[in-house]
Amino acid sequence: MLLLGGKALRAGPLETAGRIAVGTGASMRSELMAARTERGAGRVSIERIPYPVDQAVEILKDVRHLILVGTVKPVAFFAYPDKPSLLTPPDCEVHTLAGPADDLPAALDWLAEELGVRTTAPELQVSQRPDLVSGALTTESIGSAVGH
């Protein structure tokens, strides 16, 4: 799994990470408290590591290699009663490709080149607009009109 944070969550690096994920079959997530994530139609979609400890542990339970790009090893907040502090399983190897202060786009470009996936097409979000509705004005019909 690729775990992204910081400037790795901008459009360009996120697209490169998407190429790596598609080309290798790896999954990817973002750190929980990301300051900024570029999202929307035409961009690579990424989900965050969940905040609740049990959900985060469930997401990470089968991860054997966690590659950090612009973030640190995921941990639970301090001293949560009867919950693990480390969210990764004991047999998970954590690899730091690039730390938060490193050149994240260059690190991802290098990895994509090494893996031979520079030209692999990433999965991009498609634009989804609601259908126009007719009839009485309701909160749903107004929302649909605004969303269209």
Each language-model region and where it sits:
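A polyampholytic, Gly/Pro-enriched intrinsically disordered region
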Residues: 2, 48-56, 113-124
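Flexible, glycine/proline-enriched loop segments at strand-loop-helix junctions
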Residues: 3-6, 95-99, 129-134
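Glycine-rich, anion-gripping cofactor-binding loops and their flanking helix/strand elements
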Residues: 6-97
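Generic recognition of stable, solvent-exposed alpha-helical segments in well-folded globular domains
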Residues: 12-16, 55-58, 103-106, 110, ...
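Generic secondary-structure signature for well-ordered alpha-helical cores
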Residues: 22-26, 65-68, 113-120, 147-148
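Gly-rich Lys/Arg/Thr-decorated short loops/hinges at beta-loop-alpha junctions or inter-strand turns
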Residues: 39, 88-91, 115-130
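Ser/Thr/Gly-rich flexible loops in soluble cytosolic domains mediating phosphotransfer, phosphorylation
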Residues: 93-114
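Active-site diphosphate/adenylate-binding microenvironment
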Residues: 123-148
